Amino acid sequence: MTTDTIVAQATALGRGGVGIIRVSGPLAAHVAQTVTGRTLRPRYAEYLPFTDEDGQQLDQGIALFFPNPHSFTGEDVLELQGHGGPVVMDMLIRRILQIKGVRPARPGEFSERAFLNDKMDLTQAEAIADLIDASSEQAAKSALQSLQGEFSKRIHTLVESLIHLRIYVEAAIDFPEEEIDFLADGKVSADLQTIIDNLAAVRREANQGAIMREGMKVVIAGRPNAGKSSLLNALSGKESAIVTDIAGTTRDVLREHIHIDGMPLHIIDTAGLRDASDAVEKIGIERAWEEIRQADRVLFMVDGTTTEATDPQDIWPDFVDKLPENIGITVIRNKADQTGEPLGICHVNQPTLIRLSAKTGQGVDALRQHLKECMGFSGNQEGGFMARRRHLDALERAAEHLAIGQQQLEGYMAGEILAEELRIAQQHLNEITGEFSSDDLLGRIFSSFCIGK
């Protein structure tokens, strides 16, 4: 438990009808007595004057006192709800800081104390920041699911399954004299496969949750005059890029942040790829390749009037060979209004082919639907949770160790190695909820929060 008391403004900085100051720590009741002149009843809203050290009134408003452990942080908490002007808020905070033993809160310190006092786990604490920063209704719903413990429940279920399997495996190791070979009886193999399958399902949902939080990066790439800028405008619904018949009009990277049924996408238009002699155009092409290498998916724009080919290897093998491994690619045959080709998704094998007209907008809805399906997302889904990059990394490492354990079990009946791999996998899963986390990791997470959270 901490011994110091912290204070910060819990509402956003700036002018507002109401401003809230939050105090947490062992001196919260003393602060309430000092500022209001009253001993506050627990969990009662009382309308009182807030005074300075000379008894002069600074403001008046509602005071709320929450004794530990029944508070957000698990400590004694005081909230003063006054008028939301920055001057009034500043005067009240300076008044509270005059009380010995009270200091300003660090960013995220209230949530950090809630975590340290077991009021929430790490995924729930992170969900507070994600809910505040949500850029769409769907993102807010997903963050709320995480805050309510949906992600944590999935992780705890996996951990409990691992614990039970570890007990069984380690018992088989500790009692080798038993006539029954526990490792070979099929139960261990079946239980391990079930855990691997359940982890894979959580990873799929977590990947989707990470996209909901961070957005999917989609890069439009191709030769000059293929219609890349027209497609950016069609997807964004506005004239973001200049469109002309002159090859090489786009010389720099253009970005638009859009939502498709609540799914955030970062759409990036790039310079036409070719052997350029112009120095400025060369820089634009270099930047285009930088964006391509970092993309979640590349939309390979093809001028449908210049070729009938649909396989990217036939259209431009040098371009395909330069793409990073495992990057998603969708072939877009543009200018269907001129070629008369059937619109929409033509085949869903790798890579998917879509025929459209960026100029008229025909077929663009099929592309929007395709982008959602690429990430396994449906705007009508409920119950999804928010995830962060560190969660994905921990889930991936856990899956890797389970796979190693499975190989050792099936190939060598190596119970000791399996037990160790199960232990490491459990440790990685515990990192997600904070049951096993370094102080450095906690510091990085909570330092990104708002001051009063």
Curated annotation (Swiss-Prot):
It comes from the Bacteria. GO terms for molecular function: GTP binding; GTPase activity; metal ion binding. InterPro entries: G_TrmE, GTP-bd, GTP-bd_TrmE_N, GTPase_MnmE, MnmE_dom2, MnmE_helical, P-loop_NTPase, Small_GTP-bd. Residues 215-376 form the TrmE-type G domain. PROSITE patterns: G_TRME. It is found in: Cytoplasm. (6S)-5-formyl-5,6,7,8-tetrahydrofolate binds at R22, E79, K119, K453. The keyword Ribonucleoprotein does not apply. Its EC number is 3.6.-.-. It is an enzyme of class 3 (hydrolase). K(+) binds at N225, T244, I246, T249. One of its GO terms (cellular component) is cytosol. Binds 1 potassium ion per subunit. Exhibits a very high intrinsic GTPase hydrolysis rate. Involved in the addition of a carboxymethylaminomethyl (cmnm) group at the wobble position (U34) of certain tRNAs, forming tRNA-cmnm(5)s(2)U34. Belongs to the TRAFAC class TrmE-Era-EngA-EngB-Septin-like GTPase superfamily. TrmE GTPase family. This is tRNA modification GTPase MnmE. It comes from Vibrio cholerae serotype O1 (strain ATCC 39541 / Classical Ogawa 395 / O395). The gene is mnmE.
